[in-house]
Regions:
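N-terminal cap/lid segment of alpha/beta-hydrolase-fold proteins
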Residues: 24-80
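Short beta-strand element of the alpha/beta-hydrolase
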Residues: 81-91
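Conserved alpha/beta-hydrolase
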Residues: 105-130
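Conserved acidic catalytic loop of the alpha/beta-hydrolase fold
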Residues: 200-221
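Conserved alpha/beta-hydrolase fold motif
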Residues: 222-223, 246
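Gly/Ala-rich beta-loop-alpha elbow adjacent to hydrolase catalytic centers
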Residues: 223-232
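The feature captures the conserved acid-bearing segment of alpha/beta-hydrolase catalytic domains
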Residues: 245-311
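Catalytic active-site module of serine/aspartate enzymes centered on a nucleophile-bearing elbow/loop
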Residues: 318, 322-350
């Protein structure tokens, strides 16, 4: 019993020390001033749901809403001077991606707000606060659908995340020049949640909801990462009217048709990749990079404004796949903000 108590006290002390360290990192910052903050949903459709097997109480047959997208926002004073920025997370994650980093530093959402940008964080449809459609699971549980019809639910293991996010050449061994705060990697693992995108219809409702959100905001810059990295382009091909700019971070690029490229060539586009793309067993990042280079060139050849920002070519080394959480995340945010000012905001002011 004494040993258990001792272990508990050690864990408690470590937790408190971690919290204090995180607070110390934020102590010198000025108060965050907001004009408003809040949340809402975009999209959604009604669907009939049969009562689950063995349901209790009032959980009978009825209607539910599915495919909606949860959005939270923060709007700073003087925000009308800038185009809103919508940030969408990748696989097995939520909009926590953009918030406070695993080691307690400022995330991109707050930094962009402090730079007078209205920021909207979206949870992909079927993920986190957006909810998911349980009907197929209930049908299998009720015996009306065979178990082999259940979709896969992705849940990234620590080992998978380490490899795919390019933290180091082997699990537990970080790159010597790595920018991710490895001492806080356990905090990142806590952010990993089930990915139910395989339950969604095609086209993915997140694309439609992102396009609708851009229209609702009377123009927005759409930013995607990893799984959602090409979502801004997909949203623009559904309805480009509200999309003022596209920022795609570390993703596989799709092959575009001539008409699709023509649509995207009218929207300023930035693609960003980090370091160690040739890492073996880590998600075919070199192939993704090559595909995105071809995409950027396609848009440029069509007369569009597109740029590939490969950080090592800028002399910035060691960035992981989770570059918005890396130790130099604010340096990278400044690169993006500068690109926005030159390629999106400048055109808006003309």
């Amino acid at each position: 019993m004494k040993n258990f108590a001792g272990v508990f006290l050690v864990l408690l002390a470590l937790t408190v020390a971690s919290a204090i360290a995180a607070q110390d990192k934020r102590a010198k910052e000025k108060p965050l001033v907001l004009e408003s903050q809040g949340s809402f949903f975009v999209g959604g459709e009604t669907k009939s749901l049969a009562a689950p097997a063995g349901a209790r109480g009032g959980f009978g047959t009825g209607d539910i809403t599915i495919n909606q997208m949860y959005v939270q926002y923060q709007i700073p004073p003087n925000s009308d001077r800038h185009v809103p920025v919508v940030m969408v997370h990748g696989c097995c994650l939520s909009s926590k991606t953009w918030e406070t980093t695993p080691d307690g530093r400022m995330g991109w959402n707050e930094y962009f707000v402090r730079k007078d940008r209205p920021v909207y964080l979206a949870d992909q449809s079927s993920r986190a606060r957006s909810g998911f459609d349980p009907s197929l699971f209930n049908a299998v549980r009720g015996g009306t659908t065979p178990p082999n019809q259940l979709p896969n639910i992705l849940a990234a293991s620590h080992q998978t995340a380490w490899s795919v996010f390019r933290f180091g050449p082997a699990f537990g061994t970080p790159f010597p020049d790595g920018q991710f705060p490895i001492e806080a990697v356990d905090e990142l693992y806590k952010q990993m949640i089930p990915d139910l995108n395989s339950t969604l219809p095609n086209p993915n409702p997140t694309w439609t909801n992102m396009a609708a959100l851009a229209v609702k905001l009377r123009g927005a810059i759409l930013m995607g990462h990893s799984e959602s990295g090409f979502f801004p382009e997909q949203a623009a091909m559904i309805d480009p009217s509200g999309v003022r700019g596209i920022i795609s971070i570390e993703m596989p690029c799709a092959t575009m048709t001539g008409p699709q490229v023509a649509t995207l060539s009218k929207i300023p586009t930035l693609v960003m990749f980090g370091d160690h793309l040739d890492m073996q067993g880590g998600g075919n990042w070199a192939q993704s990079f090559d595909g995105c280079q071809k995409f950027v060139q396609q848009v440029k050849d069509a007369g569009g404004d597109a740029e590939m920002m490969h950080l090592p070519k800028l002399g910035i080394h060691g960035n992981s796949h989770m570059l918005m959480q890396d130790k130099n995340n604010l340096q990278l945010a400044d690169l993006i903000l500068d690109w926005i000012d030159k390629h999106v905001e400048s055109k808006r002011r003309k």
